């Protein structure tokens, strides 16, 4: 029997992280398998496992590795299916494995989650499979609800223990009027007329691409060009959860029925965290190098708390984000899968970009 998800460990010592993934998949009733194969010490085994797994119908691969964590990228080089990377903290607080996984070269696109976040890898795999499976989506909603309830319960417990003389419990007993801050920023950003971009607020598309600032328009253009090549329908909008929070949330609500979102942002990249807080489907994050060479944006995108993963690609790597979209949607769409395989197999992947 073929599992839907295959977890590949670079070493047996990574099992403790993989158990977090397996626990989530068990809870969500998703079939999975497990192999141990090192990208460096048993390269042929990785190759054979991935090629055979793809042939027999595995839909999602998860690579778990530490140190120079090249395993997820090697997996991606042998399959057109989506690959999720879980960097493991073995040394340098896991930063070495995080960078090795997320900065994978095009076209071996990898969806990276936070360091040691095996649980988020399981949730991301479920979100990918849930695009075409209502039962998985229902189970995911229940899981997200349990995470929300934990937050409310923890507040009640902590407040009940506070005995300060000046402590006053602030009750939320009225609705807060919706009001955007810095509305002039919204007018400035949305005044740009970008040729060839779909900006019709069309909720009947497959992908919603959201850019937080015109500063990163080149990254967005790369994504949109490749989506056009793969004939994947998409919407594009420039809006910020910081400058225009109400406009932003309204837009997410309008687009809630799309199959996946892409958030593009720099600095403290709040955009992807804001998207994933409002919806329960796949969110791909593209960090941009506005400051600190993009390291600030990368870390604020990828290291999400339990329950809310962001499928993060490399810094300024719009091309890998677009290819990851193709890998994900190709599971559910034969034409996209065929087009994607042809481009990769012929080593002609978007050579004009």
Residue ranges and their predicted role:
Residues 44, 48-87, 249-287:
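Glycine-rich phosphate-binding loop
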Residues 9, 36, 65, 86-89, ...:
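Short beta->alpha connector loops at strand-helix junctions that form conserved
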Residues 2-41, 198-241:
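Glycine-rich phosphate/diphosphate-binding loop of Rossmann-like nucleotide-binding domains
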Residues 2-4, 28-31, 56-59, 79-82, ...:
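Short coil/turn connectors at secondary-structure junctions
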Residues 14-19, 43-45, 65-74, 92-95, ...:
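Short glycine/serine/threonine-rich phosphate/pyrophosphate-binding segments
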Residues 21-27, 50-51, 77-80, 127-128, ...:
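Short, solvent-exposed amphipathic alpha-helical segments in soluble enzyme
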Residues 3, 9-14, 20, 94-204, ...:
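C-terminal binding/interaction regions
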Residues 67, 78-106, 278-306:
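Glycine/small-residue-rich loop that forms an oxyanion/phosphate-binding "nest" at active or ligand-binding sites
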